[in-house]
Amino acid sequence: LGDAERLEVADASVDVVTVAFGVRNFGDLGAGLREIARVLKPGGKVVILEFSTPRNPLFRRVYGLYSHRLLPAIGGMISKDRKAYEYLPASVDEFPAPECFMAMMREAGFKDCRARSQSLGIAQIYTGEK
């Protein structure tokens, strides 16, 4: 385990960085992205899988009811930790929209940034190259 904003890895020493459902938990999203760029070799790739808010208004509403009401209730009953299941949708709501996140990636030093919607928009796969 370590701090994603202070990786114990040499500059330009990594070919690929992958993150699954973690960047929305970075204390400083920009710093975390810059740190990923720092450790990547020139031409290195970053692949990030992260939750997203669906764009379709009807599905967004249905998914919002599920994630904000049903998931915390059921998850809290099973785990006895409702707060963890309330945090999840709140953190997704606060995460930047795909266009904004890709702008942050470019600002951190990535090029050819792309987002591919998954599962009707509840997740995105972001890619970029150093």
Residue ranges and their predicted role:
Residues 46-47, 112:
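A short hydrophobic/small-residue beta-strand
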Residues 27, 41, 130:
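Short conserved AdoMet
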Residues 15-29, 52:
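A short SAM/SAH-binding and catalytic strip from SAM-dependent methyltransferases
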Residues 30-45:
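A short glycine-rich, Lys/Arg-flanked "PGG" loop and its adjoining helix->strand segment in the class I
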Residues 1-17:
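A short acidic, Gly/Pro-enriched loop at the edge of an enzyme's catalytic core
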Residues 104-130:
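C-terminal lobe and adjacent flexible extensions of AdoMet/dcAdoMet transferase-like proteins
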Residues 3-5, 29, 48:
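Alpha-helical transmembrane segments of multi-pass membrane transport proteins
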Residues 52-108, 114:
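C-terminal alpha-helical "lid/dimerization" subdomain adjacent to the S-adenosyl-L-methionine
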